[in-house]
Every structure is written in C-alpha cells, then in structure tokens.
C-alpha cells in the first residue's frame, strides 16, 4: 500500500486497511490515485519530517529522532549527518550508543511517531537518557585521568630505576657489602609491600562480593514485599516500587532488570520444586497441575503493553526475549514458526478489540465448549464453598502465583488442555482476567448468553503443524 494506508490480514485471511494519520481501520479498500499524487505525497512526507527529540552525545555528536520515527546522528563540528556511527568513525561515541537503554530509545521513537504518553513520563525518559550519558562521560573521564596518572608515575619511576641500575653496575666493586645489605633491606620492604597489596586486593574483592550479595538480597526482599508479578515485565513492575528508597540502592536500571529476571526464575523454580515435593508426597498423581500449551506465550502477549497496528510477532519476540527464555517457551512450543503463528492470531484480537470485548469473546468460548468440559462445570458450580474461596482470593490483593493456581486447578478439573489447544479465543486475555471470568462464569454471574460475534475475527483453530 502507498502513502497513509497499510494493508493487513486477519487470521482468517480477510484483508483490512489501517490509516496511519487517522489511526482508524476499515474493511473497504481505499481509493488510491496514481501518478503525480504519489510523487507529491512523497515530497510532502519529506518536507513534513521534523526533529522531535535530540540527545547530546560526545565529541560533538547528537542523536536526533524525527517525527516519522527515523533517527540520524549529527556532528556540530563537521556539520555532517550519519545513519549510524561505527567504531572507525568514533569509538567513544559508539560505546556510548551501545550503553544506552534501548527500551527508552524505542519509547522515544514511538512517541515521535504519535504514541501517546504523559508529558511528565516523556520528561522522565529524556532525563534518564541524559543521566546515562552524563554517567558515561564521567566514567570515561575517570578512566582517562587514571591512565594519565599511571603514565606520569611510570615516567617518574623510570629515571630512578635507571639511576639505581647505573650505581649497581658502576660502583658495585668498591662498596660491595654495604650495597648488598641495602639491597636485601629493599627486597624485604618490597616483599612486605607486595604482601600487603595482595591482602588489600583480596579484602576489596571480598567487600565487592559482599556488597553485591547485600544488594541482591535487598532487591529480592523488595520484590517479595511488594508481591511483584513474576509473569510480568520489568517496565511494568518497576513502577510499583520506584518510590521505595531501596529501589535507588542500585542506580543502573539494567542491573535492576537482571535481578528482577533472576528473581522471577528463582520464584518459578521454587514453585516447581514445591509442586514436585507435593507430587512425591501425594498418592494421587492426577492432581499435578500442568498449564496449557500456549499458557505462557499468551501471557507474554498480554504483558506486551500497547500493541501498535503494525506490530508483528517478531517485535514481541525481540521485546520480550527475556520472558521467552524465563518461561521456557521453546519447551512448550519447539517450532518458532508455530510460536509466531499463534502470536499473529492473538495480535489481531489485541489490535481490533479492547479488553472488555476480549473478555466477552473469551466468555463466548467457554459457553461454546461447556459440553466438552466432561461435566466438571456442573460439579464445580455445586461446590459453592470452593467458588466463594476463589472469589475471596480474587478480591484480595493476592499474588500472581495464587491466581495462577486457581486457573490451573479449574483447567485441570475441566480437562481444558485437549479442548482449547487449537482455540485462539481461549487466549485473548491474560491470566488474571481469564481467572476472573472463569470464576464468575462458574458462579453464574456473567448473565445470560449475550453472544459477542466480532466481524472478521477469524475464530479458526490454530492448527499447529
């Protein structure tokens, strides 16, 4: 498609068109004029391109982000523009670019292209980027200063060494015994200095290791105290704890994020170990709770934040790379092709329908498969005490693992896995919303069967190969 229009396909294969200017979608193909209009549109788009954000780097370089999402590097001294800066062009500037938080730069590009954010949030992102640049410059200056001091110390030491060598070689025969005694004393002093330096270095290393362990423990306690969601992303969960003083005991957000991912993996491992222990102690192996095939991949899509009309599965994989690894998506779905195919179908629902509409689509899915749930639905509905306990847990600020346990328990008792393995509608909401709708449906709180049938939703099965 040309100009302001983009063409997309639903999972069912039906085409629809998205207007980048109005942010609206339509089924009908727009009437596009050819010829001179295409050239004028191209010229117009070029003249409309304006710088939106500018970050001052080093050595006269600036990173400029334009309103169409493109970025260029401009040098004040040479007045030249570059699409990229290589090590050969400027190694220091290249190192700075690689050290910047890519997630923040992506957000700035998104805002430049029209993504809506609060002004104070944009200011925080810019302030954080400038702080990263300032810290990089300060660290580089310290490294250069230490190098200069080392070179100066080497220059001062060299004449002394040469002088000492000259004395030993020129006058050693005339004052032999005195020189030998002095040499022995100097050797002993040097050995003591070396030993003391080694002890000092070991103490420093031990202190560094202890500091790292302390910071790790502080952050793990912080995550536990605020009951962060181990199935969510750092960009979302960090907002819950950024006002706590302990949050700033580590200034590097990359280190914070790596600790969060480590905490998520450890908590997931602990949960698995507990399930394994209970499984060993239980005589009934049928109570082992296993998630459905697309359980975690669907949750990654649910946690992806704002999904743009042109988002593709590869974008989700790149943005959520850490979660793909943490939740071992490859073990559940070995084929990347099948992973992307499933994500592509979910993206259609997330682009086309809001959360409330997707909840209704999920509820329709439950109604359609009610007879397939092996009669367990009626049995659960009669267990009022269990449903009341679930509702109480959902109303309270329960942690994510408790909510997931409810969902897995329902799915296990209803034998959901073989039924929904090829049903995309079952995955159009996240774990929390899915659990809430399940419990409300079992409690018969969702009202009469008012069906929501989205046009072109393409409720075809996933059909993984």
From Swiss-Prot:
UniProt biased composition (Polar residues): 160-175
FF domain location: 212-266
Composition-biased stretches (Acidic residues): 176-192, 274-288
Record-linked SMART domains: FF, WW
Location of region: Disordered: 28-49, 144-198, 266-288
First and last residue of the signal peptide: none
GO process terms (BP): mRNA cis splicing, via spliceosome; mRNA splicing, via spliceosome
Modified residues (Phosphoserine): 150
Classification via Pfam families: FF, WW
Keyword list, A-Z: mRNA processing, mRNA splicing, Nucleus, Phosphoprotein, Spliceosome
Domain WW, chain residue ranges per copy: 1-32
Major localisation: nucleus
GO cellular component entries: nucleus; prespliceosome; U1 snRNP; U2-type prespliceosome
CDD domains on file: WW
Cellular location(s): Nucleus
Function: Component of the spliceosome involved in mRNA processing.
Miscellaneous section: Present with 1310 molecules/cell in log phase SD medium.
Subunit structure: Component of the precatalytic spliceosomal complex B. Interacts with PRP19.
Name of protein: Pre-mRNA-splicing factor URN1
Native organism: Saccharomyces cerevisiae (strain ATCC 204508 / S288c)
Gene it is expressed from: URN1
């Amino acid at each position: 498609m040309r100009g302001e229009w983009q063409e997309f396909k639903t999972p069912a294969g039906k085409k629809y068109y998205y207007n980048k200017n109005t942010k609206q979608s339509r089924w009908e193909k727009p009437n596009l004029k050819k010829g001179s209009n295409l050239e004028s549109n191209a010229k117009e788009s070029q003249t409309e391109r304006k710088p939106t954000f500018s970050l001052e780097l080093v050595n006269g370089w600036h990173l400029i982000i334009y309103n169409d999402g493109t970025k260029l590097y401009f040098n004040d001294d040479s007045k030249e523009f570059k699409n990229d800066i290589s090590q050969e062009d400027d190694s220091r500037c290249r190192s700075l670019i690689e050290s910047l938080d890519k997630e923040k730069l992506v957000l700035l590009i998104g805002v430049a292209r029209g993504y809506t954010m609060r002004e104070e949030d944009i200011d925080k992102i810019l302030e954080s980027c400038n702080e990263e640049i300032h810290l990089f410059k300060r660290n580089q200056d310290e490294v250069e200063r230490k190098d200069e001091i080392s070179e100066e110390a080497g220059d001062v030491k060299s004449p002394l060494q040469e002088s000492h060598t000259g004395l030993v070689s020129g006058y050693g025969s005339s004052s032999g015994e005195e020189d030998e005694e002095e040499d022995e004393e100097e050797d002993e002093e040097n050995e003591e200095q070396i030993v003391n330096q080694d002890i000092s270095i070991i103490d420093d290393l031990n202190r560094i290791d202890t500091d790292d362990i302390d910071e790790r423990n502080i952050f793990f306690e912080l995550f536990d105290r605020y009951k962060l969601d181990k199935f969510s992303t750092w960009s979302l969960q960090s907002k819950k704890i950024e006002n706590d003083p302990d949050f700033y005991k580590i200034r590097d957000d990359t280190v914070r994020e790596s600790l969060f991912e480590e905490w998520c993996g450890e908590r997931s491992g602990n949960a698995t170990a507990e399930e394994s222990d209970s499984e060993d102690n239980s005589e009934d192996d049928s109570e082992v709770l296993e998630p459905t095939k697309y359980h975690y991949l669907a949750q990654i899509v649910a946690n992806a934040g704002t999904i743009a009309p042109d988002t593709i599965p590869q974008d989700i994989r790149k943005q959520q790379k850490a979660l793909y690894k943490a939740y071992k998506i490859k073990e559940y779905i070995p084929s990347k092709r099948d992973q992307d195919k499933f994500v592509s179908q979910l993206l259609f629902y997330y682009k086309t329908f809001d959360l409330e509409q997707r909840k209704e689509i999920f509820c329709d899915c439950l109604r359609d498969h009610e007879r397939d749930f092996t009669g367990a639905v009626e049995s659960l509905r009669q267990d009022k005490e269990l449903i009341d306990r679930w509702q109480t847990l959902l109303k309270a600020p329960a942690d994510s693992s408790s909510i997931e346990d409810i969902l897995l328990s329902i799915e296990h008792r209803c034998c959901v896995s073989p039924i929904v393995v090829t049903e995309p509608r079952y995955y159009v909401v996240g774990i929390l919303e899915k659990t809430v709708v399940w419990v409300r449906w079992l409690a018969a709180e969702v009202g009469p069967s008012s069906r929501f049938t989205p046009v072109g939703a393409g409720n075809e099965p996933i059909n993984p190969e």
